[in-house]
Amino acid sequence: MAKKVVAMIKLALPAGKANPAPPVGPALGQHGVNIMAFCKEYNAKTADQAGMVIPVEISVFEDRSFTFVLKTPPASVLIRKAAGVERGSNQPNKTKVGSITQDQLREIAQTKMPDLNANDIEAAMKIVAGTARNMGVTIKE
């Protein structure tokens, strides 16, 4: 019989840099999960994506074992990296902080495609373009 899931934990952690300190320790510790085992597995799976923030969804079972699913990096992180800016604009309608090309937009949309609620790449590009607009990043033709 399948194991019963007792908790779903969502965290966004830097790739390859999970450690038992907060937020990982308290989130997993309260469910009795082996924190070091999670940190080692997560760091091993995300070592090739250094510098990115990778969201993770952890399922904790009643016997205290766990499984986790890695998601794609947030669109805002990918847009900031493509535009070469530290952070988005605090007034996106007035001040623009950078710009990305259509090709970069398509690349980001393809990366995000598994996690987006979109049927084709064009719809995914519109979703990512909306995120860019809200960050004060313009899209060049």
UniProtKB/Swiss-Prot annotation:
Keywords: Methylation, Ribonucleoprotein, Ribosomal protein, RNA-binding, rRNA-binding. InterPro entries: Ribosomal_uL11, Ribosomal_uL11_bac-typ, Ribosomal_uL11_C, Ribosomal_uL11_C_sf, Ribosomal_uL11_CS, Ribosomal_uL11_N, Ribosomal_uL11_N_sf. One of its GO terms (molecular function) is structural constituent of ribosome. One or more lysine residues are methylated. GO terms for cellular component: cytosolic large ribosomal subunit. GO terms for biological process: translation. PANTHER family: 60S RIBOSOMAL PROTEIN L12, LARGE RIBOSOMAL SUBUNIT PROTEIN UL11M. Belongs to the universal ribosomal protein uL11 family. NCBIfam families: L11_bact. Forms part of the ribosomal stalk which helps the ribosome interact with GTP-bound translation factors. Part of the ribosomal stalk of the 50S ribosomal subunit. Interacts with L10 and the large rRNA to form the base of the stalk. L10 forms an elongated spine to which L12 dimers bind in a sequential fashion forming a multimeric L10(L12)X complex. This is Large ribosomal subunit protein uL11. The lineage of its organism: Bacteria, Bacillati, Cyanobacteriota, Cyanophyceae, Oscillatoriophycideae.
